[in-house]
């Protein structure tokens, strides 16, 4: 049998808006269920291919260096921008210095460039790493803009299955819409 875990996480910085998520459940030989890891893959059953563009709202970890309630004012959060009847644009808002969006897992093969689409009143870099608080493997410069702008870097990520953590370091706050692989 295949077992799955379905859960919700808060969005829009309040207790009422939720995003549905799901993960595969595995069993040990003794029939026990180890803690189910939260990933960006959902029920896909395998890592995401590091090619093309992915929306930032699939980040499975969103955090800062300061402990806070995940619905606290100003805390990074998944937001939507739309009016009734329109397709929804989702992104991570309120990314200030130390804010991190973590994605688990991507299968990297020959990735030469990673791009992010950001907008906001911020100046600094998006640091890339393959481990939480790990070695920086690339930096993407970002600046002040009130429209979505893509910027990129050539990261030092070996082929294989890795997490990707994107951490803003700088002044102000920005929004993260997508991450792209070339």
What are these regions (language model features)?
Residues 1-139, 143-182:
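Carbohydrate-active catalytic/glycan-binding domains of CAZyme proteins
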């Amino acid at each position: 049998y295949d077992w799955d875990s379905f859960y919700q996480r808060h969005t829009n910085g309040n207790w009422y808006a939720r995003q549905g998520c799901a993960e595969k459940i595995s069993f040990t030989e003794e029939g026990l269920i180890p803690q189910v890891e939260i990933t960006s893959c959902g029920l896909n059953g395998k890592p995401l291919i590091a090619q093309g563009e992915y929306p930032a709202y699939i980040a499975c970890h969103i955090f800062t260096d300061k402990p806070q309630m995940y619905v606290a004012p100003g805390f990074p959060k998944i937001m939507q921008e739309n009016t009734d009847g329109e397709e929804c644009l989702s992104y991570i808002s309120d990314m200030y210095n130390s804010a991190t969006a973590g994605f688990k897992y991507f299968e990297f093969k020959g990735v030469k460039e990673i791009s992010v689409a950001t907008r906001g009143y911020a100046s600094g870099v998006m640091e890339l790493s393959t481990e939480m608080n790990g070695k920086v493997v690339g930096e993407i410069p970002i600046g002040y803009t009130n429209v979505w702008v893509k910027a990129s870097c050539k990261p030092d990520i070996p082929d294989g299955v890795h997490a990707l953590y994107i951490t803003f370091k700088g002044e102000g706050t920005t929004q993260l819409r997508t991450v792209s692989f070339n």
